[in-house]
């Protein structure tokens, strides 16, 4: 759900109970199940910083969705806490599809100082990121480290295997279904707003800055 749809959701919730996924709309009759996406993004960027990266970019979705706001906030928080400057040329917004990732990388690699690492808002976008990096003559992770977000099964099939923030989509859906069953059965869920924590899962798409060309 996008933040510009909140008012419509609030109106609908007056007559029937609703469950939102990865949105933070609060109101009577609204239940939510969401990931701590800001923390997931923060952990991903902090990991890259721990590897020695300072030129870290984010390829984010360009839709007006809270999911992208959370990820950008986590990205910025990690940089600030490690005393790294936030550079607007490293913040790229694209269509949240494979093509968007391809276009985002082309833009980043044209900057005066291309990033040595890229945090990508979704694994789907990461597919295009991989293709563009290779087409431009760069290697993963020797020249550019990449971290995705989502934990889709396709991440394991990418070469090299994508390091990603797993948001456990199946668990997210299961908890949402269980909550709705409780609500429809006139039960009282322990919490109206449930958090599913993300986990950074290491693949082979990241390496230390000392191993890269700078």
Question: Where do the PLM segments sit?
Answer:
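Central regulatory/effector-binding core of bacterial HTH transcription factors
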Residues: 1-6
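Bacterial carbohydrate/catabolite-sensing allosteric modules
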Residues: 8, 13-214
